[in-house]
Amino acid sequence: DLPRWGITQNPLIYGNLLIVASQTSQAGVVAYDKLTGELQWKSAALSGNAGYVSPSIIKVGGEVHLVMITASMGRGRSASGGTVNGIDPLSGEVLWTYSNWQCRIPVPHAVDAGEGRVLITGGYSAGTAMIKVQKKEDGSYGITELFKNPDFGAHTQPPILYKDHFYTQYTINERSDGLVCMSMDGQVKWSTGEDPLFNKGGSILIDGLLVSVDGNKMLYLIEPDPSGFKPLASAELLEQGENWAPIALSDGKLLIRDQKQLKCLKVAQ
């Protein structure tokens, strides 16, 4: 069966591979030759329900791992079964699994926090967890949970990492924290709340500045600073609605969209 909200994952290009989150009972993740479409490998089925997470890449020591997150069964304290999986991107072998963070509808992909650290975030009160992956002498992998924090999460977009701090829009069905900043050790530094409200919109880092759609009509240019929210400019560019799409930048042109239109903005001199 198709997920309720459709197939929303992005495929991942890694070298000559096109990697997709199949999330079936036959294979959790599948890789194809990006030019010919020939099947290269498929992973084992992953524990947990199908979600909306795209596969992402992290580094563990000198190795590259593919990370895939699955959805939990149930919600709240009864949620269980969801997993975070590290996979060899060249063979599809599942290298490690972490199961102490649960989200019934996960969407944001895992974020590489450096030094083998992986940040995992979700909505529906799942909050965030950071783990550290290390290779053991016997060739297996150990997982250390560094922290969990219910006051930092993300409903649709992955957090942005800049100078050892994470920035995310944490407005979900249960709370309206707006734009939130968290340190590398899991301490929330500030949040905008509802003034201004940031509600699941896309963000991108450009030349050390945060460009964010507020999930509604506004586009913001923000200086990412752990001491406080520092907006530099804003403009009403979109029609009102649930404007949660990712932002894209190419050749000095910024692409944003609402429910009716796609806009291309020149942001480079």
Regions found by a protein language model. Give the residues of each.
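Noncatalytic, solvent-exposed loop/strand surfaces
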Residues: D1-Q269
